[in-house]
């Protein structure tokens, strides 16, 4: 049976989800305050914010498959919050590195980037997240158009790939299990995306094949569904 929440229920679900997204940040804030993050609290905080960036990014990517499997189309209305939460934790991850780890020392940061390329990969992932966060509104969809907006937001998969590479490169060989699990989950999500595209479009189009119209319809509908109907003035 398909569950379709009323507007009031959906508002309650969004409020509950928002509160849940705050829990990791509150946990680490309490850990800093109570000095319970271990021998190297700054490293624990930086890594924790990075892991939760990946967690919320992956939850964002899971929305479309879950909507398809369950028939709960209202899940799209939660995707923007999850995506912006991933960006917020990405900002905290970057901030803890620049401020608490490097103390805004530009020379030290430059040397760190040169010696530790995984930081460059992480920074690239963050830079790719910026336009996605800045274009997460109805105004952005109207300005860009549904097709271009959807094409831009496919960069979320590149962000996820770079995030996993960043994590794999960061950890030591004895601690590879967690990033490998993220890599496997990402492979499943990417595989689902490819299968879904083939199902909608047929085989990958060649130059002589005219572009299909149907995917554009889905793009517009999904973009609007993810943000909710704009209020009429």
UniProtKB/Swiss-Prot annotation:
It comes from the Bacteria. Part of the MsrPQ system that repairs oxidized periplasmic proteins containing methionine sulfoxide residues (Met-O), using respiratory chain electrons. Thus protects these proteins from oxidative-stress damage caused by reactive species of oxygen and chlorine generated by the host defense mechanisms. MsrPQ is essential for the maintenance of envelope integrity under bleach stress, rescuing a wide series of structurally unrelated periplasmic proteins from methionine oxidation. The keyword Iron applies. Its main location: membrane. Keywords: Cell inner membrane, Cell membrane, Electron transport, Flavoprotein, FMN, Heme, Iron, Membrane, Metal-binding, Transmembrane, Transmembrane helix, Transport. The gene is msrQ. GO terms for molecular function: electron transfer activity; FMN binding; heme binding; metal ion binding; oxidoreductase activity, acting on diphenols and related substances as donors. It is found in: Cell inner membrane. Belongs to the MsrQ family. This is Protein-methionine-sulfoxide reductase heme-binding subunit MsrQ. Residues 50-164 form the Ferric oxidoreductase domain. The keyword Lyase does not apply. It is a multi-pass membrane protein. Heterodimer of a catalytic subunit (MsrP) and a heme-binding subunit (MsrQ). The chain crosses the membrane at residues 13-33, 44-64, 81-101, 117-137, 151-171, 174-194. One of its GO terms (cellular component) is plasma membrane. It comes from Azospira oryzae (strain ATCC BAA-33 / DSM 13638 / PS). One of its GO terms (biological process) is protein repair. Pfam families: Ferric_reduct. Signal peptide: none annotated.
